[in-house]
UniProtKB/Swiss-Prot annotation:
InterPro entries, alphabetized: ACBD5, Acyl-CoA-binding_prot_CS, Acyl-CoA-binding_protein, Acyl-CoA-binding_sf, FERM/acyl-CoA-bd_prot_sf
Keyword Transmembrane found: yes
Family: Belongs to the ATG37 family.
Residue span of region Disordered: 119-248, 296-369
Location in the cell: Peroxisome membrane
Coiled coil location: 154-188, 373-402
GO terms of molecular function: fatty-acyl-CoA binding
Membrane-spanning segments: 430-450
UniProt-listed Pfam families: ACBP (PF00887)
Keywords: Autophagy, Coiled coil, Lipid-binding, Membrane, Peroxisome, Transmembrane, Transmembrane helix, Transport
Protein name: Acyl-CoA-binding domain-containing protein 5
Example GO biological process: pexophagy
Membrane topology, from the record: Single-pass membrane protein
Length: 458
């Protein structure tokens, strides 16, 4: 008959015998919660669902047992036996090895080895799934021309071929994208081709920013002896060679340095917000480079004057002051020291326009003027806010001082507190005297009443 028992019942009986054989004062003492679990599973496995009424309040232990048994609901006997054995497996390592425990281990079998096999199989499955994902992904990412992979040494020929195809596709997409951008720029009305040569330390990578200026630069600059770079003025109505030579602004190429931005080495942009931030950085670089190069441009007349004439009066000093202020501003904006070169002699420093007002350099053209106006507006608003804050602080200080004075006056105007009475009792003396005297008064009245009554009887 023992052979016909199911396996879960045999394991259940062995586990029950182990629990019943535990000594009361042994080394292993299960907790009350654990014993409640074993009790509920045992009752469910032997008697089925709980149908007995709940014990009364005088039996708290029975009530706890009944609650644990009733919480199992309609669990079947087989499930209760299996759950009982599972709970036994959790504490089997902490129990001392006895004959009953050895019998239970023989009935349960080597469950530790089965767990290890499951872990090993699960890890190999994850590895195989990861390998299949890596090999079956058609759209692999290529960052800076290098494909991402988990193990480059273990790639097969097919993976290498797929990676090569992905690289070629990405390169073709990039080239098509750049060509399409160039075509769109060329098709814009009233647009001229930007300068390809170095303009004040800016290379062709910044041609989009150069074209945003109202004065586009031609692709060809006149070169003069001494390594000079000429920047013609396109505002002049007549392209006269002599006027061009007078309007050219020469500058040493050795003094020019290539300006690099934080995003020169970044090819890919994560979002449009980053792209807009890069454009703002490039615009700041362009303005900073124009300040550092000491470039002087003509106004609508296109006339450049040397510092030997009118530059000594107002243009030279004011222009140096304005450039120093702007260079300090841009240096603080980009969190680096300004690289503006000090103004040289009169031949190197020119003035703008026929009026010779160097303070208006760039105020009516390009984003520089709007930037200065925005800065001025922000400073004015900040000053107003600071004044409001100071006024509020002053009003708070005045209110605090007035409140302190008011409290001081109130404390002075309060009458002097009465000295504590020396009477030891909590009641007044009159009340105490009345309480002591009234029994005698009542007794005297009763005595008088009784005497009158006796007289009447006699």
């Amino acid at each position: 008959m023992a052979d016909t028992k199911p396996l879960h019942q045999t394991r259940f009986e062995a586990a029950v015998s182990v629990i019943q054989s535990l000594p009361k004062n042994g080394s292993f003492q299960p907790s009350n919660e654990m014993m409640l679990k074993f009790y509920s599973f045992y009752k469910q496995a032997t008697l089925g669902p709980c149908n007995t009424p709940r014990p009364g309040f005088w039996d708290p232990v029975g009530r706890y047992k009944w609650d644990a048994w009733n919480s199992l609901g309609d669990m079947s006997k087989e499930d209760a036996m299996i759950a009982y054995v599972d709970e036994m497996k959790k504490i089997l390592e902490t129990m001392p090895v006895t004959e009953k425990v050895e019998e239970l281990l023989q009935v349960i079998g080597p469950f530790y080895e089965i767990v290890e096999d499951k872990k090993h199989g699960r890890g190999s499955g994850v590895t195989s799934e990861l390998g299949s994902v890596l090999t079956s992904t058609p759209n692999g990412k290529a960052v800076n021309g290098k494909a991402e992979s988990s193990d480059s040494g273990a790639e097969s020929d097919e993976e290498q071929a797929a990676t090569k195809e992905v690289r070629e596709e990405d390169e073709e997409e990039e080239s098509e994208h750049s060509e399409q951008e160039d075509k769109d720029v060329e098709q814009q009305p009233g647009h001229e081709k930007p300068a390809e040569s170095i303009v004040n330390g800016l290379t062709r990578n910044h041609r989009e920013l150069v074209t945003e200026e109202p004065t586009p630069l031609p692709s060809k600059c006149l070169s003069e002896p001494g390594d000079k770079v000429a920047i013609p003025d396109t505002h002049s109505p007549v392209n006269d060679p002599e006027a061009d030579r007078e309007e050219d602004c020469t500058e040493d190429i050795a003094a020019m340095q290539h300006l690099t931005s934080d995003s020169d080495s970044e090819i890919f942009c994560d979002s449009m917000e980053q792209f807009g931030q890069d454009e703002a950085d490039h615009s700041l670089l362009l303005q900073d480079a124009m300040l550092n190069g000491d470039i002087t441009e003509t106004s609508a007349g296109g006339e450049l004057k040397d510092g030997g004439e009118d530059g000594k009066q107002s243009g030279h000093g004011a222009q140096r002051k304005t450039w120093s202020e702007k260079s300090e501003h841009f240096g603080s904006r980009r969190e680096r020291p300004s690289r503006m070169q000090p103004g040289g002699d009169g031949s190197r420093s020119g003035q703008i326009g026929s009026g010779g007002d160097g303070d208006r350099w760039g105020s009516d053209r390009g984003p520089n003027g709007s930037l200065n106006e925005q800065i001025a507006v922000v400073l004015m608003r900040l000053q107003e806010d600071m004044q409001n804050v100071l006024q509020r602080l002053h009003s708070l200080e005045v209110q605090t001082a007035s409140q302190a004075q008011f409290l001081l006056r109130e404390s002075n105007n309060q009458p002097m507190e009465k000295k504590p009475s020396r009477w030891p009792f909590g009641i007044s003396p009159g009340t105490l005297a009345l309480a002591v005297v009234w029994p005698f008064v009542v007794h005297w009245l009763m005595h008088v009443f009784l005497q009158k009554r006796r007289r009447k009887q006699t």
